């Protein structure tokens, strides 16, 4: 979560206080994670609109490369703390710029990544793969972003409920 990233990078900054370059890097990551946390808080405040079906997506031009880079920045503290390997790659991507709601995309991907990190044992791997497919119409592509880990996984019973609101495997 962004709060874990903020705490992790703050701890790293304090332990490297004499290394100005590292501290500056950690502060940039803290700022990025703080902005994401603010975005999540705003999303929580919008929950009543989501439940009533009145939420509006804010589609803007977004660089998928930037999205993946930002995610890597946010999650890298947790990856390092658990001694995990993080792999990110793109396959067959010829157009990185898409129109989407960047906040919602980041929210979904960060939740998936945070869960992957949380449930992957030390020394494990987490990967993110972006793949582009041809769309039905010319100039319209389809994208798949897959988050994969070698963590504990989900029980078959829980998989049937993953899209129910506020569900969590016990």
Regions found by a protein language model. Give the residues of each.
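Short acidic helix/loop segment immediately C-terminal to the autophosphorylated histidine
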Residues: 14-21
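Short alpha-helical segment of the dimerization/phosphotransfer core of two-component systems
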Residues: 32-37
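Helix-loop junction within the histidine kinase core
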Residues: 48-59
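Conserved catalytic submotifs in the C-terminal HATPase_c
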Residues: 58-63, 80, 85-96, 133
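Short helix N-cap motif at coil->helix boundaries in the Bergerat
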Residues: 64, 153-161
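Short alpha-helical segment within the cytosolic histidine kinase core of two-component systems
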Residues: 69-81
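Glycine-rich G1-box
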Residues: 77, 152-153
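Short helix-loop "hinge" at the ATP-lid/N-box region of the Bergerat-fold HATPase_c
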Residues: 116-117
């Amino acid at each position: 979560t962004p709060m874990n990233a903020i705490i992790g990078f703050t701890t790293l900054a304090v332990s490297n206080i004499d290394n100005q370059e590292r501290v500056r890097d950690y502060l940039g990551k803290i700022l990025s994670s703080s902005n994401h946390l603010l975005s999540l808080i705003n999303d929580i405040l919008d929950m009543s609109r989501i439940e009533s079906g009145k939420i509006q997506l804010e589609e803007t031009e977004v660089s998928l490369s930037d999205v993946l880079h930002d995610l890597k920045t946010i999650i890298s503290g947790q990856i390092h703390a658990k001694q995990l390997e993080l792999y990110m790659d793109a396959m067959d991507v010829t157009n990185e710029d898409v129109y989407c709601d960047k906040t919602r995309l980041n929210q979904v991907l960060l939740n998936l990544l945070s869960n992957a990190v949380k449930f992957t044992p030390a020394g494990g791997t987490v990967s993110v793969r972006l793949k582009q497919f041809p769309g039905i119409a010319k100039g319209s592509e389809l994208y798949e972003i897959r988050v994969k880990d070698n963590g504990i996984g989900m029980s078959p019973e829980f998989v049937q409920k993953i899209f129910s609101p506020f569900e969590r495997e016990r």
